[in-house]
Amino acid sequence: MKVIFAGTPDFAAAALKAVAAAGFEIPLVLTQPDRPKGRGMQLTAPPVKQAALELGLRVAQPEKLRNNAEALQMLKEVEADVMVVAAYGLILPQDVLDTPKHGCLNIHASLLPRWRGAAPIQRAIEAGDAETGVCIMQMDIGLDTGDVVSEHRYAIQPTDTANEVHDALMEIGAAAVVADLQQLQSKGRLNAVKQPEEGVTYAQKLSKEEARIDWSESADIIERKIRAFNPVPAAWVEYQGKPMKIRRAEVVAQQGTAGEVLSCSADGLVVACGESALKITELQPAGGRRMNIAAFAAGRSIEAGAKL
């Protein structure tokens, strides 16, 4: 069975490797163009391209698929049975969706219809969801509105960051899409179920502005934001006129004026919130490395009563 693969980041690269390891023929891999990255802004291939080249697969990197006759013709010439799409980052128009014999399967990191859109992992943590998961979806022209082929649940742990949930769902998604491809190969079809009309939510793209900590919010809300926005864009506060990223924190039963430092020691930097307080245990000063509070406090002095 011929499988076109379309994806860009690590989340997708894991799925590509799994599909290849399962023995499926992959005549073409689509990924986004190389982009400048890092402090040196060096042109860097996306993880999917790197994985595809290691596997000896053909790679194409169109800037867009909409109104792109050359890309459409390339897809048609492959005569694929199905396309697997994972965090590709480009819109697939209807003519592209219709090209493979069995359409396009998307690996989506939420329990649809909850958290359709760009940042499902982060929004699930931010909202305090007890669980999330992966859906393999038969793509249509809508935003994550297609019928669900399979659903795979994951319990969000109280200390999980977005990075940790991402890595868990990456492995779940890779295994799930392989299982569904194997079913398609053996039965010639997939049983997909329409998404319910109730419970639809949208996972809007993250912004640096919303990641700024508002100490008037409750400690519970802020703690979830810190985990949801870890590693990027990273929750932050202004410290000595510069943004300081907050990487880890826990809720503690203390009270004070919102934004007031209650204590600073090797154990943690405790800051009062609208309700309760947060004990910050890991942070990253502007231009610096991530560090625990013991390392931070050793070179600085933040007195009780100071404002963040």
Curated annotation (Swiss-Prot):
InterPro entries: Fmt (IPR005794), Formyl_trans_C (IPR005793), Formyl_transf_N (IPR002376), Formyl_transf_N_sf (IPR036477), Formyl_transferase-like_C_sf (IPR011034), GART_AS (IPR001555), Met-tRNA-FMT_C (IPR044135), Met-tRNA-FMT_N (IPR041711). GO terms for molecular function: methionyl-tRNA formyltransferase activity. Pfam families: Formyl_trans_C, Formyl_trans_N. Its EC number is 2.1.2.9. It catalyses: L-methionyl-tRNA(fMet) + (6R)-10-formyltetrahydrofolate = N-formyl-L-methionyl-tRNA(fMet) + (6S)-5,6,7,8-tetrahydrofolate + H(+). The keyword Protein biosynthesis applies. It is an enzyme of class 2 (transferase). The keyword Protein biosynthesis applies. SUPFAM superfamilies: FMT C-terminal domain-like, Formyltransferase. (6S)-5,6,7,8-tetrahydrofolate binds at S110, L111, L112, P113. Keywords: Protein biosynthesis, Transferase. GO terms for cellular component: cytosol. CDD domains: FMT_core_Met-tRNA-FMT_N, Met_tRNA_FMT_C. It comes from the Bacteria. Belongs to the Fmt family. Attaches a formyl group to the free amino group of methionyl-tRNA(fMet). The formyl group appears to play a dual role in the initiator identity of N-formylmethionyl-tRNA by promoting its recognition by IF2 and preventing the misappropriation of this tRNA by the elongation apparatus. This is Methionyl-tRNA formyltransferase. It comes from Neisseria gonorrhoeae (strain NCCP11945). The lineage of its organism: Bacteria, Pseudomonadati, Pseudomonadota, Betaproteobacteria, Neisseriales. The gene is fmt.
